[in-house]
Swiss-Prot record:
Organism in which the protein naturally occurs: Rattus norvegicus (Rat)
Designated name of the protein: Microtubule-associated protein 1S
Record region (Necessary for the microtubule-organizing center localization): 1-715
A GO term from the CC aspect: microtubule organizing center
Keywords: Apoptosis, Cytoplasm, Cytoskeleton, DNA-binding, Microtubule, Nucleus, Phosphoprotein
Chain positions covered by the region annotation Necessary for association with actin: 874-972
Keyword DNA-binding among record annotations: yes
Gene name, Swiss-Prot/TrEMBL: Map1s
Biased composition (Polar residues): 454-469
SUPFAM superfamilies noted in UniProt: Metallo-hydrolase/oxidoreductase
Region (Disordered): 454-632, 671-854
Length: 972
């Protein structure tokens, strides 16, 4: 070895030795000590340093005193320390992202220096040795991927001599897979032979200061501007969870945080810091991939309590710091973490200790003896009902990972039931077993289900006096709710207010009152029916609750909460939370709608996707949400050019609330998977006379996944003739006979991407003028089992790439308004003409002979959004996707085990989707970037178009106020 090192000595050039040190941010003192030991071991193991050529001690001293520091503007918290000496170039990466580390590793391998050292020291998993980075992880698998890059191999092959690379990494796990590589002399974890020196100690002390964990207030920073975010529509934020997952599900009146991700700098913080309360926290599995982000939030809440009890400072500064949301019920099973960091603390034990300090008792999640009996998380008359079905674990296994299904049943008959699955690390076989126990539920047997579809049997069998009132068409009564919960909800004064309005006003006025909560005042349009509703006083979607009571020991709220209180920690299945006192001020009842309501279409077969920047109108209407990024504003004006004088944007301004600090979600921009695609042709889809039908420049890419996805927003129902707002002759045709009837299994029906005018029921094919001539505003549709399919989940986000989907039956672009006779492209050949007629006949049939069809074993279950089981929970084959049919699949968890089986999961999705009997549009949302996924996308892109599969990129952003954060918002 001495002869090899002496060869380049006469021609030794500056920086012939290259040192790359990678350190991850440490969250506890024990972890910091472990990382410093690994750093020292790595530097002292570099035997290639010839003391006659390079004095490592002097070079490290020079680094400490002369290095330059660079803070990344893209990856918050990442720092680069660099120094280039006469013989040694040193680069230290602190708290990097996975992409930054891969880029620097590529540069290290391609550098012509003959001797190189790579020290990988940071928090790592005990099982695999995978390093835990700010985003994702880094393992031996990722190292081999970078080493196998063609550009790297070409650089190594062109070198005059094979360079020597010493790698100091974890000595356990899968790092032993690193072996000899062509064109590279690789040495893995050699023993530490160099003596300790003063320069090395100074280097370690300086790095230790940079790796010390920040305070909770520095880790989770307060926003630049205060205010509360109101989420009126059902939605789900998909956050990049690093090695795990993190999601935030919200409905009108209740919010649920699911897991926290592996990054201590919580990915969900920039959203929840604008909330006054998180009503429920659901931890599907305890480990280093799901709890660090949640524990950071708990530490901040504890620090806020200590700061509030400490010396008083400036009032405004204290209010700005003490802003974390109040926490409701917490569901947590395991008492010990399933995965731990080497040298770190047990995240599950830490979470329970923090919850105990905050006075919160975590509740276990277990499947009951009757899995179809859910836990009612939230229920409010006139708003809806949120149910929690626990699919796993079974009774007697509390430490197993939990699998939860959330079902939101809104009160409005025409609104869509939302079904979201969070499996965590549940094995697929047990997940399917849990779903099989629920497949008899009507809400899981169709791709799209409305509340009207579920209330018919209850209304037929109900002996309550409410069955004879007109309000039963709008306020469904669930038979599974106990008498106590029903009477408790009934005691709310808001119900009497709504009933008085409904009983004293005529039919058309009643329609106006019911629809104002979705349309809102100030709708800018030229349609007479909307302007007729303009001067009317807005009626809210739901009465707000009084300030939410805190859990014992919880920090006091700074502002009044307008959300209903979280359920008591003693929730039991089929038990609703206690009622709350409604507010008396009608202004406080407004819920600040967050997105515009697209105007209804003129033809019953035309569907128009949500336009461009769906939440920007609410942003413009919010009194304290005017700091919009200039580039985003310019993009908005470019995508929506000025139209004719008679056309105006159907954009709804948000109603001003009594609170002076309401924050509205403004811009969402999920990027499409970035690959070369042919430019899409202009869609011949028709539209109404509003400015949504303005023709856009073909070179402008869509900025909303709602446009790129051929799905319909909940605000764009398929126009049909019947309506629950008619008080005249249509009431008889509208109401089914009062006999028990359960809908049969869903037959082949038109896909989620289109509406076949020939397949609609006869009443739905009536001209719009005939059906709605007596009404000033068209009521939301009440679709049948055949026409309900187009009401799909809308990913309300903006995409940066082109649509690129030629076979999609509905495009994001619209034709000019002077083409009212055009209808969207459909996939008629794939839809049997008899299926819609059968579905329509089934809906109109009545009598004792109507019985549900028997369910075959392994019948499919339809969901709106489903996370895929992660963390190496098990192999997902095509049978899984054949039985679990979701409109949106989320792949999360950038771990080594996840990447190893990723290609098989993606291929299984294609194979399973190919066997679906319904033509549904499916969206795949990955939370991380992967070379495996890129290759799969390039090789199978043509199949995506044929099967109706869209893949989003992992760089989605949500812009709120004056900053953006990585997330993808899915609206239902």
């Amino acid at each position: 070895m001495a002869a090899v090192m002496a060869a380049p000595e006469p021609a030794e050039a500056p920086s012939s030795l290259l040192l790359l040190v990678v350190g991850g941010e440490c969250g506890c003192p024990g972890l910091l000590a472990y990382v410093l030991e690994e750093l020292e071991r790595g530097v002292r193991s570099w035997e290639d340093v010839d003391p006659d050529v390079c004095s490592l001690d002097e070079q490290l001293k020079a680094f400490v005193s002369r290095h330059s520091a660079t803070f990344s503007s893209i990856v918050k918290g990442q720092r680069s320390l660099h120094h280039r000496g006469e013989t040694l170039e040193t680069l230290v990466l602190l708290n990097p992202s996975d992409k930054s580390l891969c880029d620097e590793l590529r540069n290290l391998l391609m550098d012509p220096a003959p001797h190189k050292l790579l020290v990988l020291a940071g928090p790592c998993l005990e099982e695999t040795g995978e390093l835990l980075l700010q985003t994702g992880g880094f393992s031996a698998h990722h190292f081999l991927q970078v080493l196998g890059d063609k550009e790297v191999q070409d650089a190594l092959a062109s070198a005059p001599a094979a360079p020597a690379l010493t790698v100091s990494c974890p000595t356990f796990g899968d790092w032993a897979l690193l072996g000899p590589a062509p064109g590279l002399r690789l040495r893995l974890n050699p023993p530490a032979r160099l003596p300790s020196s003063e320069g090395l100690r100074a280097f370690l002390e300086y790095v230790a200061e940079s790796l010390e964990p920040p305070s909770p207030f520095e880790l989770l920073e307060p926003p630049a501007t205060g205010g509360f975010l109101r989420l009126a529509r059902p939605c789900c934020y998909v956050f990049p969870g690093g090695l795990g997952d993190a999601a935030f599900f919200a409905v009108n009146g209740f919010t649920v945080l699911v897991n926290g991700g592996s990054n201590p700098k919580s990915s969900f913080w920039k959203l929840v810091r604008h909330l006054d309360r998180v009503d429920a926290v659901l931890v599907t599995h305890a480990g280093a991939d799901s709890l660090p982000g949640l524990n950071s939030l708990l530490r901040r809440k504890l620090a806020e309590r200590e700061a509030a009890a400490g010396p008083q400072g400036q009032h405004e500064e204290r209010l700005r710091r003490l802003l974390s949301p109040a926490l409701g019920v917490v569901f947590l099973n395991a008492r010990e973490a399933g995965s731990r960091l080497r040298g770190g603390e047990d995240e599950a034990v830490c979470a329970r200790s923090l919850l105990r300090s905050l006075g919160i008792v975590p509740l276990p999640l277990q499947r009951g003896p009757q899995p179809s009996c859910p836990t009612v998380l939230f229920e409010k008359l006139g708003v809806g009902r949120l149910e929690l079905f626990v699919l796993h674990p079974p009774p007697g296994d509390p430490a197993a990972p939990a699998c939860a299904l959330l079902v939101w049943q809104p009160a409005a008959p025409g609104d869509k039931v939302v079904r979201v699955l969070f499996p965590g690390r549940t094995p697929p076989a047990r997940l399917l077993d849990g779903l099989q126990r629920l497949q008899h539920l009507p809400c899981l047997r169709r791709p799209v289900v409305t509340t009207q579809d579920l209330e018919v049997p209850s209304r037929a069998n109900s002996q309550d006096s409410l069955a004879s009132r007109d309000s039963t068409r709008k306020e469904p009564v669930r038979g599974t709710v106990g008498a106590t919960s029903r009477s408790a909800v009934r005691r709310e004064p808001a119900l009497a207010t709504r009933d008085q309005k409904k009983d004293t006003k005529p039919g058309p006025t009643r329609s106006t009152v019911r629809d104002v909560r979705r349309s809102g005042p100030g709708v800018v349009t030229t349609k007479p029916r909307v302007s007729q509703n303009g001067p009317r006083a807005p009626v809210p979607a739901a009465p707000p609750a009084a300030p939410a009571p805190e859990f014992p020991g919880e920090a006091e709220n700074i502002v009044e909460s307008e959300r209903p209180p979280a359920p008591s920690p003693t929730l039991s299945p089929a038990q609703s939370p206690p009622p709350t006192a409604p507010g008396n001020s009608p202004e406080r009842l407004s819920l600040s709608p967050l997105r515009p309501e697209p105007a209804p279409d003129a033809s019953p077969s035309a569907t128009t996707p949500t336009l461009t920047t769906p939440s920007l109108p609410a942003e413009l209407g919010s009194p304290h949400s005017t700091e919009v990024d200039e580039s985003l504003s310019v993009s908005f004006e470019q995508v929506l050019p000025a139209g004719d004088a008679g056309l105006s944007l159907p954009l709804r301004l948000a109603r001003r609330s009594t609170s002076p600090h309401d924050v509205d979600l403004c811009l969402v921009s999920p990027c499409e998977f970035s690959h070369r695609k042919p430019p899409p042709p202009a869609s011949p889809g028709s539209s109404d006379s509003s400015a949504r039908s303005q023709e856009r420049p073909p070179e402008t890419p869509p900025t909303s996944v709602s446009e790129s996805l051929p799905t319909l927003s909940d605000s764009d129902p398929v126009p049909v003739a019947d309506s629950d707002d008619d008080a005249g002759s249509e009431s008889a045709a509208r109401d089914p006979l009062p006999t028990p009837r359960v809908p049969p299994p869903l037959p082949d029906a038109p896909g989620i991407c289109m509406v076949d005018p020939e397949a609609l029921p006869p009443r739905a094919r009536q001209p719009l003028s005939t059906a709605n001539s007596s009404r000033g505003r068209k009521a939301p549709a009440r679709p049948s089992s055949a026409s309900a399919a187009p009401r799909a989940a809308t990913v309300a986000a903006k995409t940066k790439g082109p649509v690129g989907d030629r076979s999609r039956p509905l495009s994001a672009r619209s034709e000019p308004a002077d083409k009212p006779g055009r209808v969207p492209l459909t996939r008629k050949p794939s839809v049997p003409k008899t299926v819609p007629k059968m579905a329509s006949a089934t809906r109109n049939s009545s009598g004792p002979s109507s019985r549900p069809a028997p369910l075959a074993a392994g019948s499919p279950v339809y969901l709106d959004l489903a996370y895929l089981p992660g963390g190496g929970a098990g192999h997902l084959d095509q049978n899984f996707f054949l039985r679990v049919r979701a409109l949106c699949y989320v792949i999360s968890g950038q771990g080594q085990r996840q990447e190893e089986g990723l290609r098989g999961v993606l291929d299984a999705l294609l194979a399973g989707k190919r066997q679906w009997d319904l033509d549904l549009q499916v969206t795949l949302i990955p939370t991380f970037d992967s070379a495996v996924m890129h290759r799969w996308y390039e090789e199978t892109h043509e199949q995506h178009q044929a099967l109706g599969i869209r893949v989003l990129g992992s760089g989605s952003l949500v812009s709120m106020q004056d900053e953006a954060f990585p997330a993808c918002k899915v609206e239902f």
